Amino acid sequence: MKYATGTDNAMTSGISGQTNNSNSVSNEMQPTTSTPTAVHKEATSTATTTATYANGNPNSNANPSQSQPSNALFCEQVTTVTNLFEKWNDCERTVVMYALLKRLRYPSLKFLQYSIDSNLTQNLGTSQTNLSSVVIDINANNPVYLQNLLNAYKTFQPCDLLDAMSSSSSDKDSMPCYGSDFQITTSAQCDERKLYARKEDILHEVLNMLPLLKPGNDEAKLIYLTLIPVAVKDTMQQIVPTELVQQIFSYLLIHPAITSEDRRSLNIWLRHLEDHIQAAAAGLTNRSYFLQPSPQLVAGGSSTGSGSCSSSATSSSTASCSSVASSSMCPASGSRSSRTNDWQTIAPPSKQLQNKLAGDWRGSGGGSSSGSINPLCDNLNGITLNELASSQNSLGLSLEGSSSLVNGVVAGAGSMLGIGGGDDHDTSFSKNGTEILDFDPVTADMGEACSLASSSLCGRSGGNPVEDRSQPPPNLQQQLLQPPPYASILMGNVGDQFGEINRWSLDSKIAALKTRRSNSLTTQTISSCSSSSNSSVITVNDNCSNSTENLAQFANKPRSFSLSIEHQRGALINSGSDTRLDEFKPNYIKFHTRNVGMSGIGLWLKSLRLHKYIELFKNMTYEEMLLITEDFLQSVGVTKGASHKLALCIDKLKERANILNRVEQDLLTGQMELSTAVEELTNIVLTPMKPLESPGPPEENIGLRFLKVIDIVTNTLQQDPYAAQDDETLGVLMWILDRSIHNEAFMNHASQLKDLKFKLSKMKISMVPKMHHVKPAGVGPNNGNINKPRWNGKTRKCDTKNGSNDRINNRKNSNDMLNFSLNCLPHPLPHHSQQPPPPLPQFDYNGYGGGPSHQPQYKSSSYPSFMGNPQQQPPPPPPSKAHHHAQQMQQMLQQHNHFPALPQQTPPQSHRRSLNNLILVTGGPQQPQQMIFKPGQGVLTNNGSNDNLGLERNQQPQQQQQQRKLSGGVSSVEQQPKKTMAAVVMENLAKFDQHFTLF
């Protein structure tokens, strides 16, 4: 028979060797569904022929070099697939149909939907079938019924069986007899078989109801998922067949009611089941030492199996492997092709599966072949032996070998959903560049021998041994009869089926599985969860309470390299991006341990920069940690500097009680500042502490004393008005409270600490923010003013370019006429009649008798003085009141004087850049001037002329008369109304028009 074996055909590969044992396979499988009737066969053949003629090349996946007609080839392929389909069980058929439906287009899917609806209607026509189907459908979605079923499954525990076996072991009649071909069955064994049969019946019922689970029924789905861990554990203890649990996994992985999160959890338990199957296969190899069967019998035992699996990595190879899912544990043989994306296997490429011998499951006709192995040896304290080393099969089972299949159905379902465990499950220290096995050469050779022997257990066609590596060399056959170095460990407690296992019997061998070197920031996590999911949380085995063996293992570990110059750059480059530097962040350094007071040891070591020695404390109790000495640390491999530092810090831990007691007393007596107390609390908050409720003397309760000091400090800050409420102290105290909330010692008081932190945060917000330094009053140029110092006259720029001492105004307008001051206001001359006039009366114009150095410069020198106009000059006041008026004006000007006067000098005449450079201004104080116009010269001033003095004397009588009329016996300043700004501007403009003539 010829047919295509392309990679796209999912059904046609790996079938050639099954013609000899097809009858035995079909009888062993016992398919529950009936074969198609003759009518259906005729319809199928007609449809096949029609499809063949309708399509010129119906076999798109066939080899184009074939010479047979396409219609005959397609018919043969359909016949082959149909024959295979009849040999499969319901679960295998469902998985295959599910895989094929995903490859169809939408029209074909709709056609199949209509066909399925029609078939369901026809099949439900009979009353008996309808009634049974309805009952199963109702029970499959009834949470109450499912819960009762789960409780019944959990009720059958092996403890009752163990008691029955122990009670019946003393009876002579119950002793088994192996002298003949038959064995006397004891009452305990009958109970055992009844127990196993009941659990198996429940699993069969679950297997029938699980496909009928409706999407959206979360309550029923949760019960199905709850059954999985219990069933996997029973499989590891060889209570239920492995095939039933695998079929349940297959349905769950492809069921539309299962979400992605549910599949992740199922993937974890699937890996546990995979590890058990591989350990069982390893146990089958080890039975050669205890049972010493003939190698030919072991190789020939596969002839009783249900079929063989092709090692081709195409989708068809895995599909053919699914045909023997109910009874085979057949590994891949011969070739080493790569796996496809559609049907990738779940087993790692470095691990081998062994063929399951038919009828070898606890003597009940099917199941795992590792009956003589202690089932609890495979899972020691939750840590499987396959997870104690790297992915290169650290137990030495098969260092070299072709990839194998755990089971075709589970592999197919897992690969279709993209949860193939090959990538994640192979995670080891190889990502860190440290995958170096410390096996002896003899051990490595033994592992190679085991792999060769395991590859010979699964034949290709009807039990024929594989041509390549099927028969081991003679020397290897002798080595197979010798126990491997770990065989005594695995088989040491075979007779103690359910007894307690010596957890530390593996320490010497586990130490041999360590790597030679590791980065200083890399920790070897041996937890099953962290090994499978590549978690970064440091998980500690709770049951490993004894730390002596752990320290012995730590002592044998070579000194790890740090990230320094001795660590070569190439090793860091080749280590990949996963350097695990994030493992030692404060949020990740946590211990899940039962040792009270040791959960915070990671943060404490991180604060000391000694977190590379975190493995030293993972199984240590609080009391053992306090008894560590420097000599002990050096004896277990800690460096001298680190051991000295760690010993000093441990000695300080013993002094915490005295320190807290002293701080408490000093705070109550007022001899210690709050900042000092907060600093002491900062040094203690990260140290490991026992909970407050832990038994022990009160003086050793560090957590209680710590809370007392915190209470005193916070009460002092809240109630004492004289306490220095520093913002920095409050911030540090809030940090201490935050660390205390997450501390193991204060878990029961977290709410109180949160309330206290909230009160301190409110106090911190209500505090006055810090101001700048305030100078005392009367000091400095600003007289204690805390505001920004204002711009004064001393800082104003002078026109030194043109030789002028006048300050440059900050002009916002180009018109200089608006820059006026109090000097532009007309006020009387301060001449006293009883005193002779000074030598220079023009300096006494503004009433400042102190000379030119006391005259303030409010007016720009570019603004001319028009007070010398004889027509606009007001008459002088009476001499008796002139001096009083001058004093008042001086006081007024001093109040408005923001710019102290500078000493005046008489610079040479120079031009200014105002009024189109037509005004020549002389330096010094402004005086009454007479404007004399000369052509070509602009405006000139005649200072000190006799004409100016004469005009001034002639105007004095007129000014006196006008002043007497306005004053009426009162001073002119008191009676004269104040002029507005607009009036002053208009007056200045009028004076400007009178005295200036522009060309």
UniProtKB/Swiss-Prot annotation:
Region (Interaction with cup): 583-763
Residues recorded as bearing Phosphoserine in the entry: 564, 575, 972
Function as written in the Swiss-Prot or TrEMBL entry: Translation regulator that binds to the 3'-UTR of specific mRNAs such as nanos (nos) and prevent their translation. Prevents translation of unlocalized nos in the bulk cytoplasm via the recruitment of cup.
Span list, region Disordered: 1-45, 50-69, 321-370, 773-892
Family assignment from sequence similarity: Belongs to the SMAUG family.
Species whose genome carries this gene: Drosophila yakuba (Fruit fly)
Bias (Polar residues) ranges: 1-37, 801-822, 854-864
Compositional bias (Low complexity): 321-338
Higher taxonomy: Eukaryota, Metazoa, Ecdysozoa, Arthropoda, Hexapoda
Record-annotated SAM domain positions: 600-654
Protein name: Protein Smaug
GO annotations of cellular component type: cytoplasm; P-body
The protein's assembly and partners: Interacts with oskar (osk). Binds to the 3'-UTR of nos. Interacts with cup, which in turn recruits eIF4-E, leading to an indirect interaction between smg and eIF4-E that prevents mRNA translation.
GO molecular function, one term: translation repressor activity
Comment text on domains: The SAM domain mediates the association with the 3'-UTR of specific mRNAs.
BP GO annotations: negative regulation of translation; nuclear-transcribed mRNA poly(A) tail shortening; regulation of DNA-templated transcription
Gene name per UniProt: smg
